[in-house]
């Protein structure tokens, strides 16, 4: 029983300070690969694996065709094209998205995921001063 389709959209950025949030030296990542992963609430196998690549502004769009009422769906980082900013940190590499139509959300089937980030292995030298400003 397929429900209406959804478009999941969001942005991928590089966190050069490993801050866990965007700073004035963060930048969007073009050409990053993200996947949508859905698994049952009861912890079974993850099901849907739709992938997309980010555009020049770091945005992606993934079309998904059925309702995932009984599932937890997340957008997960898969691959960074930028070798200097390609570290993935567990739990910070994903954003949960509601993919059901009965959650009172009626945005023409568009679901916005929170921005997710790749990290630099070594923070930039100027990060100490930058982070003090936040």
From Swiss-Prot:
Glycosylated sites: 24
Keyword Secreted attached: yes
Record-linked PROSITE patterns: OLEEI
The entry's keywords: Allergen, Disulfide bond, Glycoprotein, Secreted
Top-rank taxon, per record: Eukaryota
Disulfide bonds: 14-85, 17-127, 38-73
UniProt-annotated location(s): Secreted
Pfam families xrefs: Pollen_Ole_e_1
Chief location bin: secreted
InterPro entries: Allergen_Ole_e_I_CS, Pollen_Ole_e1_allergen
Example of a GO cellular component annotation carried by this entry: extracellular space
Family as reported in the entry's similarity comment: Belongs to the Ole e I family.
PANTHER family xref list: OS06G0556600 PROTEIN, PROTEIN DOWNSTREAM OF FLC-RELATED
Protein name: Major pollen allergen Lol p 11
UniProt organism field: Lolium perenne (Perennial ryegrass)
């Amino acid at each position: 029983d397929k429900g209406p389709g959804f478009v999941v959209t969001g942005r991928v950025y590089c966190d050069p300070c490993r801050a866990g949030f965007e700073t004035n030296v963060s930048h969007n990542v073009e050409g990053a690969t993200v996947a949508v992963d859905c698994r049952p609430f009861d912890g079974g196998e993850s099901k849907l694996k739709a992938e997309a690549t980010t555009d020049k502004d770091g945005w992606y769009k993934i079309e998904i065709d059925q309702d995932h009422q009984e599932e937890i769906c997340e957008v997960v980082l898969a691959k960074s094209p930028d070798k200097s900013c390609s570290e993935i940190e567990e739990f910070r590499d994903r954003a949960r998205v509601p993919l059901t139509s009965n959650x009172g959300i009626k945005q023409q089937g568009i679901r916005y995921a929170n921005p997710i980030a790749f990290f630099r292995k070594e923070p930039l030298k100027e990060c100490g001063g930058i982070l003090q400003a936040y």
